Amino acid sequence: MKFPVLILNFKAYAEAAGRRAVEIAKAAERVAKELGVNIAVAPNHLELALVAQSVEIPVYAQGVDVESPGAHTAHVALGNLKEAGAAGVILNHSEAPLRLNELARYVGKARELGLDVVVCAPDPTTSLAAAALGPHAVAVEPPELIGTGRAVSRYKPETVVQTVQLVAKHFADVAVITGAGIESGEDVEAALRLGTRGVLLASAAVKAKDHYQKIMELAKPLLK
């Protein structure tokens, strides 16, 4: 996994359904190539294979609930995500929380499959526990700020700084990124100044009227 990175989570937004997911992913890819920065996209499971076939930038799954392919009706298996073209997986988002034993299994299996692994956590202490599982990155996201436009880098900078310091002290090989309420390039720049190695965001990019221009704004701070 390359850093610094901008990860765009499409969630299940109507604005990123079907071919629209490909359009946003291609806008992200265009920005990544023009600036020479790292951008990954996380489309809904329904669009993951289509997006992965359409772009060269990393495509991440938004989550998983089964380790291996098999008789698991209506479930998503890590092995199948790999076959669909996923380069990585986001785990334990506040909108899709996992039990610790599940999280530990999924992190281990994803690493075994060669997938990038990003584990979300709400606070510094939980981030440290997540880092102990061995993901490539921990994304600290206070859930009360997600989708509010109140950027964690401005409204809870102490949470970000504490997480960066705590994880660096005990698990220096695990990167810390952040998210929640990120709306602008200034928010991204502030997050990087706090010591993070990237940002995870959703609505600011997905719901933008001009995806290319918005992603360009959000990605430019990665150059500094």
Curated annotation (Swiss-Prot):
Sample GO molecular function, one term: triose-phosphate isomerase activity
Keyword set includes RNA-binding: no
InterPro entries for the chain: Aldolase_TIM (IPR013785), TIM_sf (IPR035990), Triosephosphate_isomerase (IPR000652), Triosephosphate_isomerase_arc (IPR022891), Triosephosphate_isomerase_AS (IPR020861)
EC number: 5.3.1.1
Gene giving rise to this polypeptide: tpiA
Sorted UniProt keywords: Cytoplasm, Gluconeogenesis, Glycolysis, Isomerase
CDD domains: TIM
Location(s) in or outside the cell: Cytoplasm
Catalytic activity entry: D-glyceraldehyde 3-phosphate = dihydroxyacetone phosphate
Active site: 93 (electrophile), 141 (proton acceptor)
Pfam families: TIM
HAMAP family membership: TIM_A
Disulfide bond sites: none
Protein name listed in UniProt: Triosephosphate isomerase
GO cellular component, one term: cytosol
Annotated function: Involved in the gluconeogenesis. Catalyzes stereospecifically the conversion of dihydroxyacetone phosphate (DHAP) to D-glyceraldehyde-3-phosphate (G3P).
Residue ranges crossing the lipid bilayer per the database entry: none
Entry binding sites for substrate: 9-11, 146, 181, 202-203
Pathway assigned to this chain's UniProt record: Carbohydrate biosynthesis; gluconeogenesis; Carbohydrate degradation; glycolysis; D-glyceraldehyde 3-phosphate from glycerone phosphate: step 1/1
Subunit structure comment from the entry: Homotetramer; dimer of dimers.
Keyword Isomerase among UniProt keywords: yes
